[in-house]
Every structure is written in C-alpha cells, then in structure tokens.
Amino acid sequence: LGNRTGIDLPGEKRGYLVDSAAHENRHKRLKWKWARGLILNLSIGQGELVTPLQVASMVGGVGNGRELRRPHLLKEILDPRTGKVVGLPESTLVRKLPFQADHIAAIQQALDSVVNGTQGTAHACRLPGIRVGGKTGSAENPHGDKTHALFAGIAPMESPEIAIGVVMENAGHGGSIAAPIAAKIFRRYFELTGRLKPDTTRKEIHVP
C-alpha cells in the first residue's frame, strides 16, 4: 500500500499510507502533531487511501504466501496475420510482504472465517465446492449518508488463483453490497475454468 502496482496503464496513483513524517508535513500549517491515537486509527484503515487494485494486490499477496506480482491488463499478444500467440506478459515479482509465515497463516485463517465462519460477515460470498476467503469493509464517507462498501477476497483458499477487490462508493455495508458482487465475479471465473456449472438463475443486486 502507498506504492504503485506497476499495471500497464498511465496515471496510476500511489494512494496514501501515512507515517509520522508524512502526517506532520501534510498538516504543517495546522501544527497537527503525530499522536499514538493515530496509530490505532491506522490499524482499522482510518486516514489511508488505497485503490481497488491495491486492495486486490494486497489480498492476493497474502493468499499466495507473501508475493506481490505486477498486474497486467494484457492477456496475450497475437500475430494479426496468423492469429497465433506470439507473446505473453511476464509475471514479475515486485516485492515480498515482510511478514513471518505464521503471521500470514493467521491472516489466511481470518479471511477464511469471514466467509465460512458462523459469525462471518461475508456469507454472501460462499460458493458450492469452492472455499472463498475474504474481508468486508464499511468505510466512513464524509460525502454521503452511506458508507463505502468494500470486499477483498481470494479463492480457492487451499491454493488461491484469483484475487478480487470490490469498492462501491456511498453504497452501504461491505457484507451486503460488495461481497455479493465479488461472489458473482468468483462464480463466473470458476464457471469459465470448468469448476462450477453455469448459474442459469438470474439474480439482481440493487444498490440503494
């Protein structure tokens, strides 16, 4: 977080991950000093700015055991005359998350519990035969009467191959708004890869 992912698009933003020096420089005119209470706020995401792609990249790194890889929009390069594949984007390792293996395992277990645990907030993201893990979020919104709804998830938990970040502005709670959207994306991915049968029933998600 706080760094560009390196995706092959111009204009990507870094987001904002605050530390004491950055905080005091940003609020120099108001003389708002760094305080311990700000650390508690940061632990729940208060005062930070992230892009949906950073959210997906982060949860993907947790899922695959600490590796952050550069995302690409490009799937393959085709020869226009023959239609044959002549190139593929490289899977470049950007960095490794600086966490111990047991810490990563604890986070993975927590992600699993959010979707599959009895008190989890993302039951809407469950899929038959596919174990999904994730985290919901409902971020305070100073520009509307509803929170921003967030969900970050990976699947399948035993060997993750897809990571998703969903952000719905001024939409409500992450568990009731963002998680069902993520479930549709997960389902479609596993339908396309042959792990799930196509869902013939159409369900609509209404965002107030």
Regions found by a protein language model. Give the residues of each.
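Beta-lactam-recognizing serine transpeptidase/beta-lactamase-like catalytic domain environment
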Residues: 1-167, 174, 205-208
